[in-house]
Amino acid sequence: MPALFVQERMGVNRKPFRMFKFRTMYDRAEEMRAQIEEFNESSGGLFKIRMDPRITPVGRFLRRFSLDEVPQLLNVVRGEMVLVGPRPLPRRDFENYYEEWHYSRHQGMPGLTCLWQVSGRSDLDFHNMCILDVYYLRNQGWLMDLKILLKTIWVVLFARGAY
């Protein structure tokens, strides 16, 4: 099983791109999703389960401290992502949007971290994630980015809302 996981995500202006992560799930995790869909603890375009059985023990550690996201620095270097911007959703989750305004979160470049990650992370539902993403896009600037980057360090170190 390769250490890197590549998944199609939705980027700026709904353009798909290949996002890199360290693998944190067992093989055939996507096939298993249908069997555990009823345990989804989120809504809309998000699929979150606190004790997701598809995640390996090492994967749980990597996710707890967001270390699985490190390969996305390659996406930043390639110009597909920026440090701060709305997190890109997997294409499958993207197709679950249920209100037209939710798509407006794709008017900016996707980022490694974002306002909703430092405001609750996985504890926020899809609707509030979109509200924070749209707020960020309408108010973004270097000072807001700096605040989000600094808060990200705190959130990651203390694993706030990580699962």
Q: Can you say where each PLM-predicted feature lies in the sequence?
A:
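Conserved small/aromatic sequence motifs within transmembrane helices
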Residues: 1-163
